[in-house]
Amino acid sequence: MNTVRVTFLLVFVLAVSLGQADKDENRMEMQEKTEQGKSYLDFAENLLLQKLEELEAKLLEEDSEESRNSRQKRCIGEGVPCDENDPRCCSGLVCLKPTLHGIWYKSYYCYKK
């Protein structure tokens, strides 16, 4: 019975002493991993920030192009109905009542001068 107690005590002492060494090693490993994790998070954050900035630049560029191209025309082209009281025909055109084939229409149209 004494040999069992001595063996158990010996195993217990070895486990405790080696466990302490492992605990210190584990603490060191955890510190290294957290430092690496922080650097990885910083890298990932910078990468995400760059992608967002590129996306923002593209969106702003598209908005500026869209605003240039979305300007409405302020004049009416040739052969398009117009209002005789408020003619908005383009330069070189006049708002006139149709002749010949268009006399049955009650509207005015933009024609060349």
From Swiss-Prot:
Propeptide segment residues: 22-74
Spans annotated as Disordered: 61-83
Keywords tagged on the record: Disulfide bond, Ion channel impairing toxin, Knottin, Secreted, Signal, Toxin
InterPro entries membership: Toxin_22
Signal peptide, first to last residue: 1-21
Disulfide bonds: C75-C90, C82-C95, C89-C110
Record note on domains: The presence of a 'disulfide through disulfide knot' structurally defines this protein as a knottin.
Similarity comment: family membership: Belongs to the neurotoxin 14 (magi-1) family. 01 (HNTX-16) subfamily.
Protein name as catalogued: U11-theraphotoxin-Hhn1a
Organism: Cyriopagopus hainanus
